[in-house]
Amino acid sequence: MKRVYSKIECIAGNVITVTAQGIKYGELAIVKAKDTSSLAEVIKLDREKVSLQVYGGTRGISTSDEIKFLGHSMQVSFSDNLLGRIFDGSGNPRDGGPSLDDNLIEIGGPSANPAKRIVPRNMIRTGLPMIDVFNTLVESQKLPIFSVSGEPYNELLLRIALQAEVDLIILGGMGLKHDDYLTFKDSLEKGGALSRTIFFVHTANDSVVESLTVPDISLSVAEKFALKGKKVLVLLTDMTNFADAMKEISITMEQVPSNRGYPGDLYSQLAYRYEKAIDFEGAGSITILTVTTMPGDDVTHPVPDNTGYITEGQYYLKGGRIEPFGSLSRLKQMVNGRTRDDHRTIMDSMIKLYASSKDSVEKKAMGFNMTKWDEKLLKYSNMFESKMMDLSVNIPLEEALDLGWDILASCFSPKETGIKTDLIEKYWPKKETS
């Protein structure tokens, strides 16, 4: 069967169309132009009309260039040699290191059989009190970080990559600014975490098509490591850039647009990636934490809106902090009852008092008279925000719980907290006597 063709029917954006037979959806091809060659993937079949998206872009490609079909879908090497390496969205080295061509695996396969999944039961410690104490990240969970442009969401992901108690970090960047890419790279090296990290990166200067492959490559590699018994944390940023790349391709393909121009299968495409999160019985796990930026801080935007129906909660990053109101880990109750007996009490009591303090902050701003209780709440609010909510705080869960008791004791009497007597007697800080 003929696998090489030398006539391109149409070039539109990053998509080319050829007439070919015996071609499969998702199959790879090499487009050989005059001075270069680019990888392309079949994205549409209409009888003998085959549409391919060119990863390197179509600049310099003419209608007489040669297209050679490879007979397989996209593949990536899988071995421990991936650790500490940086690759682009096609799986090619970006760090100047050698190419890896052994033990190739296909990317983008189906999600694991639900019957093989086990109930989430283990906590992933991050060293961030707003996660560990108040909205615990659970092994095999899928959670987005909802934020807006300008917030330090990549810095938050970086801190989690450096501090999370997992075996392996797979970091996927889509549409990253070059400065952000260098920050990730340099910080992981200085923090000593690059040796347990695999970095797949697509920058804003790269072809938009490569943005689509980053999540699939990251998750396919993660799945193989999880089957080998590794606890893998996949960090993806930014899923809105991923969706925008889908939107651009669908417009080029003249597909009927849906909400705000996004393709009609946006939900399915997002769910397909998030459903890779899993805890294998007798093996490892995949936990997925992503950044989803909200244009105009609009949570009804199609990307965060669809994401919210797929994931098991969300973190809201506002004002450089993880907001306790709106942030939610729906699986936290699976683990926070087995950490320390005061975990849930501290979590509930501190958030309740912080919510009350918001009224006092508003009263003060409007010039109302402040009661002694208001003054206590204001003091508590300041301490809670500086010692618990600040992203620079890095302490173990047990220290964070002890810190919670110290903050409560600094601002309130035991009766004012509403905490049960037995826990007060066990954990309330004892006043030092000289």
Curated annotation (Swiss-Prot):
GO terms classed as biological process: proton motive force-driven plasma membrane ATP synthesis
Cited Pfam families: ATP-synt_ab (PF00006), ATP-synt_ab_N (PF02874), ATP-synt_VA_C (PF22919)
Domain of life: Bacteria
Keywords: ATP synthesis, Hydrogen ion transport, Ion transport, Transport
GO molecular function terms attached to this record: ATP binding; proton-transporting ATP synthase activity, rotational mechanism
Record's function text: Produces ATP from ADP in the presence of a proton gradient across the membrane. The V-type beta chain is a regulatory subunit.
Sequence similarity: Belongs to the ATPase alpha/beta chains family.
Protein name per its UniProtKB record: V-type ATP synthase beta chain
The organism of origin for this protein: Borrelia garinii subsp. bavariensis (strain ATCC BAA-2496 / DSM 23469 / PBi) (Borreliella bavariensis)
Encoding gene, per UniProt annotation: atpB
